[in-house]
Amino acid sequence: MRQPSKKLPETLQVIAQSFPSGTRVCLLFQDEGRFGRIGDARSCWAPLPLRPTVGSQLVREYVYAYVAVSPADGQMSSMILPWVDTRLMSVFLAQTAAQFRNEHCVMLLDGAGWHKAHELTVPINMKLLPLPPYSPDLNPAEHVWEYIRENDIRNPIFSDLDQAMDTVETSLHRLHESPEVLRSMTAFPWIFEPAA
């Protein structure tokens, strides 16, 4: 697995020093995932000689799940919203800041345009730090989508967008209630290595 720049620990130390002393600093990784009604066929096991078949649909309706994950303790903030843009990203950041209101958060995120827009409202207890370009493998939050697709949205046929949204919401709620599962997916060793 690729590792981020060796400057990350030093960068985090500098950011932590900018926060008031005595406050806990929380490291979060953020990402968005798209879920909808287009079929996503997945493999499955079946006894011989059976050969399972899976239905498919091509309805282009989507919702977007926003998550911010704390690999250190398995805590997560999430929202399901109709699209991705600067305004809704600001809403998500405000919710995350409220959830982690007793901490100062450093949030690592990818380089999506709505993450860098001048109109983005970043809460006072939060600093945003971009991940290197073209490096989804460095973002532990990506594993949340993999988990949801493998465990809850295998070969789906949704009758409407609300059914897809309910399935994603149930899966996110289960992850909220299972910090150890979330931690096991997101606690990459390089995150906790001290600065050399």
Regions found by a protein language model. Give the residues of each.
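C-terminal anion-handling pockets and recognition modules
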Residues: 23-27, 142-196
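RNase H-like polynucleotidyl transferase catalytic core
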Residues: 50-59, 124-143, 157
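Short catalytic/ligand-binding loop motif for oxyanion handling, primarily in non-cytosolic enzymes
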Residues: 36-38, 115-117, 137-140
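A generic structural signal for alpha->beta connector loops
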Residues: 24, 104, 125-128
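RNase H-like two-metal-ion nuclease catalytic core shared by retroviral integrases
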Residues: 1-2, 109-111, 129-153, 161-164
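Acidic/histidine-rich, metal-coordinating catalytic segments
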Residues: 31, 103-115, 139
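Short, aromatic/basic amphipathic alpha-helical patches
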Residues: 117-125
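Extended, low-complexity cationic-aromatic segments
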Residues: 3-94, 188-193
